Amino acid sequence: MELFLSGKKILLLYARFFGYDVIVKEKLESLGAHVDLYDARANINSFEKAIRKINTRYYYRKQRLFHEGIQKSNKTKEYDFIFSNDVLDEEILKQYRKTFPSAIMILYIDDSVKNMKGVENTFKYFDRVFTFDKKDSETYHISFRPLFFSDVFMDENCIEGEIDYDISFVGTCHSDRLSIINLIQRKYSNYKYFFFCFMQSWFMYYYHYLLEKEYRNVDKSFFRFKPISISDVAAIMHRSKCILDIQHPNQTGLTMRTIETIGAKKKIITTNPDIKKYDFYNENNVLVIERKDPVIHKSFLIRQFQPLDENIYKKYSLNGWINDLFY
């Protein structure tokens, strides 16, 4: 793999998400590739995000201008690969094809297709299309490849650290996540918790506050408005007995946090029953709970994580993910 990517030119159009774009770039570069990284999305403020829901034309116009700038800045380069993990307008994709005709174009879908409006209409512009969702891979006849964990989660010094929490959760506050967290806290008040519930902006907080009673019952200090680094996520995981995962109700694919528990060698409590269909599933390490009536027995918290086969760690590592997408 290292020899294969050596000297390859890659244009990475990666929707920014807690620094994973930089981690992927750095890993590709460590394998010998020359990488140009851009956010797949034009920079918009909270007000513009709200406008986007009402007037999509405004957003697409801004997106096209943004990507035209990327193409003009790099038009003399002969990319071997162009990677995207976001929904790009068909006109934008046509222009990438025209500007970089020899590039292999790769799309990786890290959300459910139903949550990415129109993405299925863009498949024809890509040479390779992957999804993290097994059901979507079957429905749309595209390649299935779960997400990855980065190297920091396998840091042995962190793995052997002290345990401070029974259960920890780190994630964006969306859908019914807050109600499930509150329900678990009320039901199991004797457990030690760490919660990092990220809100993308104050605008989003007040939007939920006005419309949802659950948000009015929680002090605003509970929410975090600055994203957490991946190294800090790993540190919190290593100080926890179990990791709580609450996938979006419209998703069946496994979240990044779920895959990261493999690298961190941590047990997971999840609302996603599809985890039972994966090769790393072990009922000693995985507890599936109901969204409306979560049951978390003390016996699950105190049992030790059972190590997995070495091939599982290789498969779900960032190296394994890159190998499947680019090789």
What are these regions (language model features)?
Residues 283-289:
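A short acidic/histidine/glycine-rich donor-binding loop in glycosyltransferase catalytic cores
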Residues 70-75, 156-158, 296-303:
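Short amphipathic alpha-helix with an adjacent loop that forms part of the alpha/beta core around
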Residues 58-78:
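An amphipathic, basic-hydrophobic alpha-helix
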Residues 292-327:
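A charged, aromatic-enriched C-terminal amphipathic alpha-helix characteristic of glycosyltransferases
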Residues 2-64, 85-86, 91, 114, ...:
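Nucleotide-sugar donor-binding catalytic core of glycosyltransferases
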Residues 261-262:
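Short alpha-helix at the nucleotide-sugar/activated-sugar donor binding site of glycosyltransferases
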Residues 12-13, 72-88, 106:
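Short N-terminal targeting/anchoring amphipathic segment
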Residues 97-112, 130:
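Active-site proximal beta-strand in glycosyltransferases
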